[in-house]
C-alpha cells in the first residue's frame, strides 16, 4: 500500500501531520499544510472530531474519486455520518431532485416574482429615506427566513414568526448539536442527548414543526391525488404549488416512495424542514457579503445599477433580466470565491468550511493518480479556501475584484457563477456538486438587484470588513469585523 509522502508509517497513526487542530492556530496549520503538501501534489491528513480522519487532496488529484458512484463514495454519507443528522432527518433522492427541479427557468421566474413582491413589501418598514445604521446580518436573516418560509412551504407560512423562529432553531441546531456531541466519546452520546439542554431543546422543537406542517402535508397529498384523478391540466395551479414542499411530496408520489403511515409522513416533513438548512443557511450569508462588498466598494454600485436598469428596461421584475447582467454574475462569483469559500454551515451566526468536495468512502477505493488504497469510512476533501486565495490561480487573490470574471470586450462573463473548476469549488465538484446551486445563486442575485435598485448602501470605512475565522477543525465559527451597514431608500428607485 503506497501512501502520500507526508505519512511515513502506518495508514494514519504516524502519518498525521498534527499542528493545531483547534483554536487560533488552526487556519495557519491548514495554510502550512496547503503549501507543504497540496502545492506539491501531495495528500496530507488531519485528525478531526471523534478520532475521524480526513485526507486532504490537491484539487487536480480529486478527479479519481469525486465522480465515483454513490455506493463507493458519498457526500450524503459524509454529512449524515459526521454527526446526528440521520437521527432527525433522512435525506432521499427525491430531496435532491426537487432542488434540481427548481433550477428550471419556468420555476425560477415564478420564484423570482415572489421574491421581489415579498422583499419590496418588507423592507420599507425597516429602511427609510434617511441614512440609518443597521445590523445587515440580522436584516438578511429576517428577510431570507421570511422568503424561505414562503418559497419552501407556502404563503400561509410567510408571516408566521413563531414558525420562522423554530426553523432558525432547527437550522442552527443541525450543526450546533453536532458540535456538542463531538466533545464527547460516541459511547456517551445517548446520555449526553438526555441531559444537555441545547440538544434537548433542539429535539423538543421538532414536534412543534411537525404539528404545524403535518396537517398541511396531508391536505396537499389529497389535492395532488385529486389532480391526478382529474388530469393535472384541468386543475388550475395554486400558490402553494410553487413550493419545495409540494414538489417534494409530488416527487415521492411519482417515485412510489410516499408511505401512508404517520411515521412516513413525518419523514417527509423533516425532509421539507431540512430545506431551511440548505436555503436560509447559505443564501443569507451570501446576500450579506454581496451587500457588504457593494457598501465597501461604492464604485461598483453605479455600474451594477446601470446594468440592471438596462436589463429591466420596459420589463418588470418578473422578466428574465438576469440573463442580461454579466457584471452582477461576475460579482457573485467573486463573493463566493473570496468570502464564501466553501459550503456554509450554520451555528449561532454561521460557519464557513475550510474545505469542500467532501466525501466519505463507503467501500475501499483505489486512487490511481496517487497509487493509493483508501479504506472505507475515511473522509476526503479539497482545501477550497486556500485554493481560492492562491495567487497562482487568482492575481491579488485577497483583493475583492467584483468584475474579475467579466469580459468588457464581449460584455459577458468568462465563466458562470455556478460552474465548478479545479480552482473554484464553492459548490463542491463532481457527483456531489450542490444540486441547489443554480437556484441559490439566482435567488441571491435577484435580492441583491432589488437592493441595488431600491437602496443606497455604504460601509463605515473606519470599521473592519467582515470575515470568518476558523477555530474548529474543518469549520469556521467566528465572525470578525463589523456586520453594520449604512442604508437608505433611493429617491429615484425603480419599483
From Swiss-Prot:
Enzyme class, broadest EC rank: oxidoreductase
SUPFAM superfamilies in alphabetical order: Cytochrome P450
Pathway the protein acts in: Alkaloid biosynthesis
List of residues binding heme: 434
Superkingdom of origin organism: Eukaryota
Coiled-coil ranges per UniProt: none
Keywords: Heme, Iron, Metal-binding, Monooxygenase, NADP, Oxidoreductase
BP-aspect Gene Ontology terms: mycotoxin biosynthetic process
Family: Belongs to the cytochrome P450 family.
Protein name: Cytochrome P450 monooxygenase cnsC
Annotated source species: Penicillium expansum
